[in-house]
Amino acid sequence: QEQTREFQKENETLKIQRFENTFFNMLSQFQEVVNNISYSYQDKEIDKIVSIRGREAFYVSFEMAPRRPGISSWNPEYENRPYQGMSEVISVLGKEVYMDAFTPSYFDHYFRLLYRILKFVKTSPLIAEFDAEYEYTSMLRAILSRYELVWIYYNGLSEYGEEKLQPLLERYAM
């Protein structure tokens, strides 16, 4: 009986190690995706194309990069006006415009991988308790910058994320 108990304990340890190996590999891949994000835009003040990489792309594209929403259903007065970053587009036109306002496709892979990590934690049979799920997703949340969280928030509210991503974001208080 003692031997059976030891075997079960060892088996549980191996399951957790297998889960953690996959989870931390996914986090590593996520970090690689973040580091490889690149974004370029024309800065009219210095008359130069500015290229941004990594986490800085989240900040620049939200606060600084010029945007033209191109939303035909909106008031034409706003249609062709340049905006200073997605934050200004949202503050002038509302969060509903996120989908139409040139949502950056260079974040697509980022959002898909984020979703896969959260879904992996939620659906893994190797983790039985919510507290353990929450602990792992807290590790993920800890590596996200403020502007990543802002983009994740709006993506979760959009038609891209409302059905699948948003429930996971709420579940893990992200």
Outline where the language-model segments fall.
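Membrane-aqueous junction of the first/signal-anchor transmembrane helix
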Residues: 1-15
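Intrinsically disordered, low-complexity polar regions and short flexible loop motifs
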Residues: 12-174
